[in-house]
């Protein structure tokens, strides 16, 4: 067993990288873990804590990938400094929002894994797609058009990073890479892009059918820049 898995509870409680768990978070998660074990939805306490620790590590790595997607042309998984030519001349991407979305989306995946229930998801911030794509590449949940191009290897992540906001066009005048600036048809799990901040999320109350579950990442985009006739407090 790897050293960081010798004591799953202590491993998770200690956090990882910039991720720190408050006493309140630890208390609530302990109660949740005990309830899930009692309900036989997760095998045992150690398994649950191992999943929690894994979520921290995926989140930390995905946030690094998101930052690289905005500023860099490639990633060095060994941690060596990048050269000046490895940085994009014109950085683009909604980095702040995407960094916030990473732990939210990983938390959604963690909830699915802990409970054995796959939920749908709606993200009000379609422009934060870097978070979704980074996490998907790391865990191997990419779309058919992305399979074989993006993965968690250094080469696969570097292709993801280099393709982001590349505006590459093929000979037919179509996008040459399966990656956009917003959630789109090539984003695994995405089925709709509202085209207006918060438009799709306004329907979240009515979206799931009876017996279905939905996780919604609400956006305050209306306060950010757009207040249209459909504006509503979130």
Model-derived features: where do they sit?
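Cofactor-binding active-site loop characterized by glycine-rich and histidine/acidic residues
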Residues: 58-81, 92, 97-234
């Amino acid at each position: 067993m790897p050293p960081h898995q010798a004591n799953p509870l202590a491993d998770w409680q200690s956090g990882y990288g910039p991720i720190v768990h408050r006493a309140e978070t630890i208390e609530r998660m302990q109660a949740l873990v005990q309830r899930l074990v009692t309900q036989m939805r997760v095998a045992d306490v150690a398994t649950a804590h191992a999943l929690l620790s894994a979520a921290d590590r995926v989140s930390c790595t995905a946030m690094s990938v998101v930052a690289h997607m905005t500023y860099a042309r490639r990633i060095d998984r060994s941690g060596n400094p990048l050269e000046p030519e490895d940085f994009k001349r014109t950085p683009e991407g909604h980095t702040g929002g995407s960094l916030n979305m990473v732990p939210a989306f990983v938390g959604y995946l963690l909830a699915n894994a802990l409970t054995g229930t796959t939920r749908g998801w709606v993200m009000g911030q379609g422009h934060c797609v870097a978070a979704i794509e980074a996490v998907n590449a790391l865990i191997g949940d990419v779309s058919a058009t992305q399979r074989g191009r993006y993965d968690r290897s250094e080469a696969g992540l570097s292709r993801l990073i280099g393709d982001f906001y590349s505006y590459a066009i093929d000979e037919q005048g179509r996008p040459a890479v399966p990656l956009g600036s917003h959630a789109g048809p090539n984003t695994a799990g995405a089925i709709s892009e509202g085209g207006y901040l918060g438009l799709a999320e306004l329907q979240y109350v009515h979206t799931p059918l009876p017996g279905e579950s939905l996780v919604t990442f609400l956006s305050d985009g209306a306060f950010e820049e757009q207040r249209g006739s459909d504006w509503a407090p979130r």
